[in-house]
Amino acid sequence: MNARDLLDKLRRYAADPRGLALAWRGLRDRGVVARSPLFDREWYLREHPDVAASGVDPALHYLVAGHPAGLDPGPGFCGAEYAALNGLPRSANPLAHYERRGRRRGCRLSFLQPEGGAGEGWRFPTPEEHQAAFPEKVAAVRAKAARGERVRAVFFVADAAMFPARPLLDAMRRDPRFDARIAIIPDLRGIAGGDPLPAMERCRAALAEAYPPEALLPVSRGSDGQWPDVLSDFGADLVCHPSPYELSDFKYNPRWCVGRPFLPVHVNYGYYRSVYDRHVMASRNYALFWKAFFECDATLAEYRERSILRGANAEVVGYVKMDPLASFPPNPGPRKRVMLCPHHSVEGGANDALALSNFLRYADLFAELPARFPELDFLFRPHPFLFPVLSRPKFWGPAKCAAWRERFLSRPNASWSSGGDCFPEFAASDAIVQDCGSYLVEWLYTGKPCCYLLKSETDLEKFAPLGKECLKRCHLAYDGAAIERFLRDVVLAGRDALAAEREAFRRTVMVNHPHAADAALASIGEALGFAPGPPASP
């Protein structure tokens, strides 16, 4: 949340007596938080560059905007853990509570902390201390494997359409040395709405079509409101996290593995290509992974430069997420089809570098394209969070969202993606118009033309060197006329001046394609003492 969002929030508070009381409590607690040894001002500003750039007081930002958005005040305090341990309501600020009452009462700061009170001098282990514990954990799993026992792995999934490690899961499920399962976890960030249960059920239904019932571990909220410790209940050895963000209950976030016998691995959801990704790479959670798998030498070099561990826990295996694309040969059919893929960040993000979306600017044009180009088919595939965000009262609301969808689909050459894997749609499409982050590189795997939407040339500074190289192979659009020229000249007329250059460049980003998952599995297997060999057969 940036400074503008913070001011908007304060204005909304001022119009609501209850909100005004909450804002006053936040202002009152500012000094308490600012003086706390657990509030790390420099760390907070470094983790959230938009706050530093805005000049907003970091303690005030944490109280009014940061805590409601799930941000922590420092590397040694996890608000979600403290709130769960001590029964705090969602409205209570965890750090303010600890300094006003919890410290005196001996409240525990973390599940890692020994029972029996706060214990002055206790602190959260550093990433280096956490990494130093991995050899002992690895030795325990190696011993288990040497006895002929299967290595148990859990893949956390919050959205079936955002499951980058799925090819690695499938590779493990083909390998008799592993017992790999899925645990569908709640996304508690509130991006897609308040109640996580409907999204969990949709995710379960989608994955149940591809996996047997025993592959899906049961995850349900208890009558006390708590979520189960899936890793301990299953006896997991490995856990694959879907994100370096703390998107779910604390038992499903990377931090939960500290001090516990699990080996956490991570497969990137998006091919790292933006300035915002540097902020993610520098995060504490990335330093908690045993193995972080990267796509190519360029992204690994960025991680080594930015990460706390200077890349010591990372290696290049290729872009695991894109392996399945090779199973869908191009089959465009008799008519050319164009994908329309807008990003969700209509309100910005944790950093302005994530504010990629141009949808509100081009919504009318997108709705009219099927009528303007009847010789083309259009498939609308928005980011999964776009319409949940637009449904909020501050944007369109549900009725306007439904009306826009009906307007777009009123033409016979318009269709709406049902979500899930993008690979069949990528293979069956001839071009894309988009402003998404991950699709910038992923579409390159198809070799087909891309029209990338930018607000202005200053938007180019949101991209890291690799992202800028990708954009050089895209047809850039700064206005609606450029979008229509792309459809008319490149898609219909076939005058694609970037085709040869794009084909040569995409080979440099497609490392180990389509066997990146096999490379990741080989890395894990080697660390666990498995004999090297070819990928497991289906």
Where are these regions (language model features)?
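Non-catalytic membrane-proximal stalk/linker segments that position and tether the catalytic domains
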Residues: 18-25, 110-152, 534-538
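Nucleotide-activated donor-binding/catalytic signature segment of Leloir-type glycosyltransferases, i.e.
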Residues: 394-418
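Charge-rich, low-complexity intrinsically disordered regions
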Residues: 2-122
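A donor-sugar binding/catalytic signature common to diverse glycosyltransferases
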Residues: 418-462
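Active-site and donor-binding regions of nucleotide-sugar-utilizing enzymes
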Residues: 154-324
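C-terminal amphipathic helix plus adjacent low-complexity
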Residues: 121-129, 480-538
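Conserved catalytic-core segment of nucleotide-activated headgroup transferases in glycan assembly
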Residues: 164, 168-179, 320-403, 477, ...
